[in-house]
From Swiss-Prot:
Main location: cytoplasm
EC assignment: 5.3.1.16
Keyword Ribonucleoprotein (UniProt): no
Name of the gene encoding the protein in the UniProt record: hisA
Active-site annotation: 9 (proton acceptor), 131 (proton donor)
Pathway(s) the chain acts in: Amino-acid biosynthesis; L-histidine biosynthesis; L-histidine from 5-phospho-alpha-D-ribose 1-diphosphate: step 4/9
Gene3D superfamilies: Aldolase class I
Protein's recorded name: 1-(5-phosphoribosyl)-5-[(5-phosphoribosylamino)methylideneamino] imidazole-4-carboxamide isomerase
Family: Belongs to the HisA/HisF family.
Amino acid sequence: MTQIIPALDLIDGEVVRLVKGDYEQKKVYKYNPLKKFKEYEKAGAKELHLVDLTGAKDPSKRQFALIEKLAKEVSVNLQVGGGIRSKAEARALLDCGVKRVVIGSMAIKDATLCLEILKEFGSEAIVLALDTILKEDYVVAVNAWQEASDKKLMEVLDFYSNKGLKHILCTDISKDGTMQGVNARLYKLIHEIFPHICIQASGGVASLKDLENLKGICSGVIVGKALLDGVFSVEEGIRCLEN
């Protein structure tokens, strides 16, 4: 069944939202991240998603203490991403109690290391974040969306699915933080070609209709801004996906 996965992006402990990954287009929310996650958990969320934007920019400043506290204080699965660049970082996050680590640009820039991480920690502990943008075809973007690689999304998926990949988090960059609606066609295409891969959809969720459009296609839908802005609640999202 498709799950709603509430998300928080954190910079120096503050809950923020960026538009299309741009640190200059930042909105700060006056929420305590632990209280917010507990609120989402109480509402029925079975998984939570955290992006460490401080660590993404500077790995030496990764918010390990806060991440460990969040992982210990909530009783549901927490997955964490944000510029993970090494096996040591992935291990440190898992040691903090994180259920899944999200690997992004590394999948394109250093496939050997990415495969080592997949092998060492197992396919249930790793989510491949494939941020994509439509050129002539869907290509994967790297470096916090600063540049488009020459790697086609479907080719990357084909490569890793043959190496045991089980979970992906796919973001249509053109949609992220815009609340313009999800790119359901993209996720349907991935699901048709790779039915064994669990897809987490991200970017552009603006209404319950978006959740409806992804029901049965994706294993999870990551929702950040729509929940923070009160467009709909976790309870409403769950009801929509269960009906």
